[in-house]
Structure formats: C-alpha cells, structure tokens
Amino acid sequence: MPLESIWADAPDEEPIKKQKPSHKRSNNNKKNNNSRWSNESSSNNKKKDSVNKVKNNKGNHESKTKNKIKETLPREKKPPHSQGKISPVSESLAINPFSQKATEISPPPVSPSKMKTTKTQSKQDTASKMKLLKKKIEEQREILQKTHHKNQQQQVLMDFLNDEGSSNWVDDDEEELILQRLKTSLKI
C-alpha cells in the first residue's frame, strides 16, 4: 500500500545549487605594477560578477539584466594627442565645447573715464607710499642717532673709569657736576 502525502505529487528534480561568491584577487603585489593588466583584470571581474548575477536572478529580472549587459557599449578610445599639429577650431570645440583658443581672448574694452581714475589712484598710491617711506626713514635715523649717542656716552664713561687719575680738572665743582650727570644718565 503506497503512502499518500502532499509531497508525493512533487516533481523529481534536484534542488538548485547556489554558486559560492568568488574571491577577488588583490593586485597589490609589488611584482605586478603594470597598470594595464590590473585594469583589464578588474573589468573582467566586473563582467564575471554581472554574468553570475544574471544566472542567479529568477523570473522577470533575468531578462532585464541580460538586456542591460547587451546594451552597454564599450568605452570610446580617445584619439592620440597630436604632437605639434594645430587642429581647426571646429575639431577642438567638438571635443570640448568649453575650450577656447588663446588667440581669441582679448582684454575687455576700458572707457576713458576709468583710465583717468586708475592714473589718479596710482598717483595717490605712490604719494601715500612715499610719505610712509619718508616716515620710516626718519624713524630709523632717530633710532640710529640714539644708539650712536648711547655708544658715545658708554665710551666716554669707560674712558673716564679707566683713566682715573690722569685728567686735570680746573674746577672741582665742574667735576662733581659731570659725575652727577653720568650717574643720572646711567640710572635712566
């Protein structure tokens, strides 16, 4: 007596096995520095992945992905750069419509009134710069005179201290006055 079950009517087909995801090779190897080969291998991996996706998809999605793969066109190759050859304007604009020749660019027209203002502004700028330079020169002269005067005072003091008994003073009051001035100048 055969057993009756819900599964008895099921077809005798093998279950669909899913493919394991393939591991990508890393192209970071020091020996493999050729960029052309690495680019081709990466594009091949992408193609393999898209083919695997097409096989794994079920139902209506399968036909859509196949059509997308067929519709994609290979990238257009760029023409090699011409060496010293001048191309007509139409060709350069066809390649890049935003590019312009260097000879086509001209400076914008300047009105006479604007030209006058630039000249007067430049005169004013030079006059103000000259005043500023004169001020700086005067400041530097004053600083130089002060340092020179300090050096002279220091030299006179050193001479006076080193030659303690050699100077003959006519008046003792004059000697005390000079010593007092030296002491006050050193304190400042």
Curated annotation (Swiss-Prot):
Record-linked InterPro entries: mRNA_transport_factor_GFD1
Gene Ontology BP terms: mRNA export from nucleus; protein transport
Annotated coiled-coil segments of the chain: 119-164
Biased composition annotated in UniProt, kind: Basic residues: 18-28
Modified positions (Phosphoserine) in chain numbering: S87, S106, S111
Entry keyword annotation includes Nucleus: yes
Primary site of residence: cytoplasm
Bias (Basic and acidic residues): 59-79
Disordered, as annotated region: 1-128
Membrane topology of the entry: Peripheral membrane protein
GO CC term, one of those recorded: nuclear pore
Low complexity: compositionally biased ranges: 29-44, 112-128
Oligomeric and partner information: Interacts with GLE1, NUP42, NAB2, ZDS1 and probably DBP5. Forms a complex with GLE1 and NAB2.
More about this protein: Present with 2733 molecules/cell in log phase SD medium.
Name this polypeptide is given: mRNA transport factor GFD1
Native organism: Saccharomyces cerevisiae (strain ATCC 204508 / S288c) (Baker's yeast)
